[in-house]
Amino acid sequence: MHKTVATTAEFLDNWDSRVNFLMVEECLPFSFEFPPTKQIVERLVAEQKTTGITGRLRNTSDGENTIEDFRGMSFADLMETSFQLRYPDVTMLDHPGDLFAGFTERVLIPWKRYLLDHGFEWDRCYALARVSGPNTCTGYHMDRSNVLFWNVRGRKVFHGFHDPDRWVPLEQATAGREAQIMPENVPDEDVLSYEIGDNTFLWNHLLTPHWVDAPELTFGINFSHGGLRHNGRLCRYEQHVYDMLGHNPNVQWHPETASRVSAAGLK
C-alpha cells in the first residue's frame, strides 16, 4: 500500500516502521535552488571525495569504487556510459560561490530544527549527494540509517516490499552487504514501487530492503540519520542493531553532526 505523510502527527506515527512512504507539506520545512544537473555532474566527477559505481547490478550492490573510470570524461561521454556518483557530505561544497552555497542555512538547519522541535535526537545527521546516470540502478541493499531521500531532478522508481519482514527478517537484514542478495521468486504483487519525479521526498527506513532504478539522469540528496530517537526511544529496528552488537555503533560516525551539537548551535 502506497502511503504519503503530510503532517507532523502522521510522521510521528510512521517513522518507526519498515515500509517506506512519501513526505510532503509541513514535514519539509525547507527549499533550495540547485545548480543545473550538468554542472553538478561535472563538478562531482572531478572531486577527490566522490565515489562511483557502474550502476549495473540490480540484485545485489556494486561493491567496487569505479570513480577513476569516470574522471576526465566529458558530460556527453558520461551520458553514454553507465555510472552513479556519491559525494559524502554536501556541506563540504557549501561556501560562498561554491556548488551548494547556502545549503546548510536554507536546508540542513531548518530540517534539524524541525526534528528537534518535535522531540527527536540523533547521533548523526548529514546530507550526501547522489547522481544516477540514465538506465542505471542502485542495487538491492539495506541501509544502516534512516534516510530522507530528496529526488531533486529526474525520474526514479524506488522499489521495496509491502511486507519486508516476510522476505527479509531482521536477523537476515543485519548481515554484511555481501550477503544482501535479492530473494528469488518474489511475486510482482509483493513489490512496493514508488514512481518519483522532480522534488519528491521519500522516507526510507533503516534495514528496509530496497533497490532503485533510474531510467534517466537524476540528481538527489540523502539525509542520513543514525541513532535517531523520538522522546529518547530508538526505532525498533535500530534498537535491534544496538542489542545485537551490544553497543552504540554510531558514536564515532560523524559525531560533529549529533543533535547535542546542533541544539547548541541553534540556541
Question: Where are the regions a protein language model picked out?
Answer:
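Double-stranded beta-helix
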Residues: 151-210, 227, 238
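Short, compositionally biased
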Residues: 173, 215-225
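Conserved short histidine dyad/triad with adjacent acidic residue
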Residues: 128-142, 160-165
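Conserved double-stranded beta-helix
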Residues: 192-196, 200, 223, 227-267
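Short histidine-centered beta-strand/loop micro-motifs
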Residues: 33, 138-143, 148-150, 159, ...
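Catalytic micro-motifs at enzyme active sites that drive phosphoryl/nucleotidyl and oxygen chemistry
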Residues: 10, 115-117, 136-141
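Fe(II)/2-oxoglutarate
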Residues: 1-36, 43
